[in-house]
Every structure is written in C-alpha cells, then in structure tokens.
Amino acid sequence: GGDIDDLKEVSIPEDLFESSSGFNENGTAQFIAQVWDRAGNSIVGSVSDSILNIDQTLPIGISLELTSSNSINPDMVIPGDSITFQLNTSENIEAPFFVINGDDYENAIGLGKSWMLVYYAEEADDGVIEFRVNFNDIAGNPGKPISEALDSKTLIMDGTPPELSDITLFTSNKY
C-alpha cells in the first residue's frame, strides 16, 4: 500500500490488450488509469504522455551478400583480405549483431534497412568462414537469424602458405 501518488506497476495480459477496441498493427495506444480504494472511492488519472506504437511484424532479411577483397579468387580469403557483409531487410532495424567464426562483432554501419560490416580475416582459422547475423526491428521484434548468403555463397579462409617438397632438378645441358 501507499499514497495515491505512489507509482504502481500494472500488467495487462497480452490476449486482453490485443482484443481491446482499436488494437491494430501500426496503431498507437495511450493509457489512462482508474483506481479504487477499499472504501470504494475512485479517481481517474490523466491520459499517459507515453504512446505505445503497435508493431507485431517481424523484420525479414531480404538479402545478405558476401564479398571477398581477394582479387585472384573471389571465393577465397587469405591474410590481408577482408570480407564485406551487406545486409538488407524488409523494414528499418537496429544495428545488427554479427558472430563470425565464434567472435562477436557489433560495429556494423548503416541506417534503416541497409547495413554493412567489414571483417578483416587476419586471425581467421583455415576453412569455411562461418557466421550468423542477428537483428531486431526498431520495436525490438527479432528477425530470423541469417547464417548463409542469399546465393548460398561461402568463403574459404586459406592462411597456410604453399610448400614445395620432393623437388628434382634436371638439365639437358651436357656440361
């Protein structure tokens, strides 16, 4: 208990809120409270300054493109190369979160529906570059994580220098 001026947290069940008159996608909601005490006295508060924007639509990853800076083979990455991840979504999102070969990257740049991250492959282990992109729309609705490029392109890290073995020299010179 406490005075009428005390702040109280009230929860409205999801199904009750969604079935209320005027609830619709892209709509807004404001709240007003009516409170009764044990003696039956009541008071109606003023309309809340807070406006709730209703957004239940999940964002969709429209495309994710991978581009290697390797000029000899665009499907390979070697030390010194970079990989550009270009993400496009169905609606404006917060900055996406990348996990590349088990490491977290939160430094994507972009705005709205288009985001890019440049990954420098210096420390990557040899093999396929594995990744997952997590993203939420502005309302916080999560998109389905993306773990492959739209065209299913994969990039392979090869940081092992070539070796020569069993070299035999011969000459046709008589001398």
Name each region found by the language model:
Residues 2-18, 111-118:
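Aromatic sugar-binding surface patches on proteins
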Residues 37, 48-67, 148-172:
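Flexible, low-complexity linkers/stalks enriched in Thr/Pro that connect modular domains
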Residues 36-42, 136-145:
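Short, solvent-exposed loop/turn segments at the edges of extracellular beta-sandwich modules
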Residues 42-48:
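Extracellular fibronectin type III
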Residues 80, 89-95:
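Short proline/glycine-enriched turn/loop motifs at strand-loop junctions of beta-rich domains
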Residues 71-81, 171-175:
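Short, solvent-exposed loop/linker segments at the N-terminal edge
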Residues 30-36, 130-136:
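Extracellular recognition modules
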Residues 16-28, 120-128:
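Surface-exposed, short loops/turns at beta-strand junctions within beta-sandwich domains
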